[in-house]
């Protein structure tokens, strides 16, 4: 999944090494296999129709119009953010607000997976601050520097229902490719009340 918004301020100098990723999916060969690359990809579970996954990368969430906005309008009920967000004073609280706000605005589950402390450098410290929010509520919060996973259940049926009820949530699927995948259901004990 390519990154769309490249930070080039403060401690970030990504534009000297990278260019923004393309939105329209293209087929490339990688490790001897053909695969799609691009930001406008949705991954739909055959067994759970309400589970439609999309992804964005780190800075994309912090931008004025994150790719996740288009992902949700295209049908994503779960957005994953693969991030290497460094730690500064007050950033963990701000990150929580961003993740919760985006999940509320998009009527989706938002999974935020941060680089861990073992990935820190001499220039930046990463805390492994992993978060899961659903429709504005923070469901799981792995404390920074604790080395924990964020784990919970998601009520995807509720997300679909909320979108159907909200008349200003207008789906727009142009330019998106959906890749179906299989995920056989497994019975688990619920951990969420």
Residue ranges and their predicted role:
Residues 1-193:
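Enzyme catalytic cores with a strong preference for nitrogen-chemistry domains
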